[in-house]
Amino acid sequence: MSELADRISWRQLREFADVDLTRSFVLSWHVDADTLVIDVDLCLESQHPFYEKPPPAEKECIRPAYIEFPYCEHLRQDGGERGEAAEIARNIGYGAITNLCLRDDGQYAISGEFGTVIIKAEGPILRLKGS
């Protein structure tokens, strides 16, 4: 099987039902205890239970949210060395998300304007702020 065939796309993960990560934006990264927390502006699709029609000046329903990876053992960015998760998280940039997948080696990969970040952790949890 090819490398792509061995991956599970974010679209197949129930945590991301009715959202569009490719129209979402990473604002910051940090580690809280052993959980990687990615602060995002999340694009909700019209089927999402918290979707609200955007005002005329906006095209999308964007809500502040967190993507959390509990029990984060390590992070690696763009082929760099593994290291202390909190230190690596502090140095990751921000920007639009292009992809998130579960790789065939059991690690997650999130890509975007900030590069590609490899995450060894439990499965992601999506939390809307204020809900």
Task: Describe the function of each predicted region.
Residues 1-131:
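Surface-exposed, interaction-prone regions used to assemble/regulate multi-protein complexes
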